[in-house]
C-alpha cells in the first residue's frame, strides 16, 4: 500500500458552524494524520486559480463566491492510500447521496456547501498541496 499525501479544505460553512474538531476527528479516526494545517481567507484570485478546472461550468461563480465568503482551513493529510481513503470518508459530493458515517452524510445538507474538499488524484494532490504549502511547512 502506498503512503500518500492529499489536500483537504474545510470550507467556510465548516468554519462558520464551528465543526472543525468534528471533521478532524473523522480524519484521525480513519488513520490519516494531519501534517500541516492553516486557516486562511481565500482571495477571489486564489479561488479562481484553485478551481480553474471548473471555470466554464455554470456553478463556477457561485463556488468562487462561497469559497471567499469566510475563512477556510487547508490541511495536508498523510497515510496509506490517503487520497481514496479521504474521499471515502468525505462521502458523495451531494450530501443527499452521501452515506451516514461520512463527513457530508453527517454534517452537510447542500451540494454547494458540502463542508470539505479533497484531492481526486495523486497528480492533483501534488498540485493542490503546492498551491497552499511550501515543502518546508510539511512536517
From Swiss-Prot:
One Pfam family in the UniProt entry: NDK
Does the record bear Cytoplasm in its keywords? yes
Question: What domain of life does the UniProt record list for this protein's source?
Answer: Bacteria
Q: Which Gene3D superfamilies match?
A: Nucleoside diphosphate kinase-like domain
Q: What is its EC number?
A: 2.7.4.6
Signal peptide region = none
- Coarse class of the protein's main subcellular location: cytoplasm
Q: Which residues form the active site?
A: 117
User: Example GO molecular function term?
Assistant: metal ion binding
Which cofactors must be present for this protein to function? Mg(2+)
Give me the segments passing through the membrane: none
Q: Does the keyword Iron apply?
A: no
The compartments listed are: Cytoplasm
Q: Which InterPro entries match?
A: NDK-like_dom, NDK-like_dom_sf, Nucleoside_diP_kinase, Nucleoside_diP_kinase_AS
Entry GO terms, CC: cytoplasm
**What GO biological process terms are annotated to this protein in UniProt?**
CTP biosynthetic process; GTP biosynthetic process; UTP biosynthetic process
Family assignment?
A: Belongs to the NDK family.
Its job: Major role in the synthesis of nucleoside triphosphates other than ATP. The ATP gamma phosphate is transferred to the NDP beta phosphate via a ping-pong mechanism, using a phosphorylated active-site intermediate.
Stated name of the protein = Nucleoside diphosphate kinase
- The organism encoding this protein is Wolbachia sp. subsp. Brugia malayi (strain TRS)
